[in-house]
Regions:
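NAD(P)-dinucleotide binding in Rossmann-like oxidoreductases
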Residues: 208-213, 222-295, 305-314
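N-terminal binding-site loop/beta-alpha segment at the start of enzyme catalytic domains
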Residues: 341-413
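C-terminal helix-rich "cap/oligomerization" subdomain common to oxidoreductases
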Residues: 66-68, 296-355
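Conserved SAM-binding strand-loop segment of SAM-dependent methyltransferases
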Residues: 49-55
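Predominantly a Rossmann-like dinucleotide-binding segment in NAD(P)-dependent oxidoreductases
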Residues: 123-201, 208
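Hydrophobic residues in well-ordered beta-strands that form the structural core
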Residues: 53, 92, 117-119, 253, ...
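N-terminal Rossmann-like dinucleotide-binding module
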Residues: 1-47
């Protein structure tokens, strides 16, 4: 396989796992960045590469093909945007961003700059997961009943990223994205689709003193009548397993997320039929789960693809939309969910706007663009501001709300 020259943003445990996995691939680690220069030095002493102080300094370095983003959730959008604008391919840790608006904007940047963007959901690449979806597709009928959990218990200070509001803490974003993802994919597998989004989400949970979810549960309702009950927690332990049933047969997976990574790269899928007869399917890989993810990304990179076939852009966007809805059930809100509180704008100013056809409306002293933007489908101020800014940055200046205001003005004068 051809070689990608990598940069890594972040020096935490997941960055270390990625750097270790790189040794199993043909990739080369060129540089590692941290806000703390000494941490970058310590990291590179163990895994190689050049230590860089400051994430943006690494992003602007020449000679790097792709960048793995392993920083806290609230920084994903800013760093991924900067990478894509410099045409550096991006493998971004899950969740791709804090909310669906940011994910939407990254996808747009990926397409505009013709640069690969992929969410790092390592479990989705693994043969075990693909086998699960194959069984669902070939041997099950809807509707399905799904139970999926990812829970653990840790005692961390309020400043830790898992529970810190300013760092995008909370169980839903950190690990709830897994049961949400596998539920959507299992339903999709029934219909030869990559995923199906739920039509209704009902959720509840426990919040900390920063109004961030320590644990959360949700019931997902799908159009075909399938139901998924999912749970995530950072203050409760569970088996963190997955079951998928159609009433006739049931799939049991006891290592759905790490797929045997910590048990000799061996895992097992159990199937029980209506007669309580068991079938065991053994899964074994020569490479670790993160190395498989890197190889998949590398193949997409050298095929000059903009997105992964197993983790396409619309999948990442759909999962983030569902996570947004789950958080809203618990009233978990981050500053980056509010357009008026964002520190980094979702849409960059476009200084080279094209001149569009315009028209004159009585009562106004300037022309308006002939293209009108509808204002009735924005989910929140964050989404609204992003859509309006994008509309205006492309040289368009007229909205339904503006037209309504003009009509009132004309009628009343």
């Amino acid at each position: 396989m051809k070689q990608i020259k990598w940069g890594i943003l972040g020096t935490g445990s997941i960055a270390k796992a990625f750097a270790e996995a790189l040794k199993e691939t043909d990739g080369e680690l060129l540089a590692v960045a941290s806000a703390n220069g000494q941490r970058a030095i310590d990291f590179c002493n163990s895994y190689g590469g050049t230590a860089i102080e400051g994430h943006m300094n690494l992003i602007s370095m020449p000679g790097i093909d792709a960048i793995y983003i392993a920083t806290p959730h609230t920084s994903h959008f800013e760093f991924a945007s900067a990478c894509l604008k410099q045409k550096k391919a991006v493998l971004c840790e899950k969740p791709m961003t804090i909310n669906a608006t940011e994910t939407m904007a990254l996808i747009d940047l990926s397409r505009k700059n013709k640069t690969l963007l992929m969410e790092a959901f390592m479990y989705k690449i693994h043969p075990q997961t693909q086998k699960i979806f194959e069984i669902v597709n070939k041997r099950m009928k809807g509707p399905l009943s799904i139970k999926a959990e990812f829970c653990f218990s840790v005692d961390v200070p309020d400043t830790h990223r898992l529970v810190n509001r300013d760092l995008g803490g909370g169980s839903i974003l950190d690990i709830g994205c897994y049961p949400m993802s596998i539920s959507r994919h299992a339903i999709g597998a029934l219909y030869d689709r990559n995923f199906v989004n739920p039509i209704k989400i009902q959720g509840e949970g426990e919040l900390n003193n920063q109004d961030i979810d320590l644990n959360a549960s949700a019931e997902l309702i799908f159009e075909d009548g399938s139901v998924a009950k999912i749970r995530s927690a950072t203050n409760l332990s569970s088996e963190s397993d997955v079951t998928i049933s159609d009433g006739e047969m049931t799939i049991y997976v006891n290592q759905p997320w790490h797929c045997g990574e910590f048990t000799g790269r061996e895992s097992q899928i159990k199937i029980v039929n209506a007669n309580d007869e068991e079938e065991l399917i053994d899964i074994k890989t020569d490479k670790g789960i993160y190395a498989l993810e890197i190889d998949h990304f590398t193949e997409a990179f050298f095929n000059e693809e903009l997105e992964s076939t197993l983790l396409p852009h619309n999948d990442s966007h759909g999962n983030t939309i569902a996570l947004d809805q789950w958080r809203k059930e618990l009233k978990v809100v981050y500053n980056d969910d509010r357009g008026e509180k964002r520190k980094v704008s979702v849409i960059s100013k476009n200084d080279s706007r094209d001149t569009l056809l315009s028209t004159k409306i009585p009562g106004l002293d300037k022309n308006l663009s002939r293209i009108v933007f509808g204002c009735d489908n924005q989910s929140d101020t964050n989404h609204a501001f992003a859509m309006f800014d994008h509309f205006h940055s492309n040289g368009k200046m007229c909205s339904i709300q503006l037209i309504f205001t003009i009509m009132v003005r004309v009628i009343t004068t």
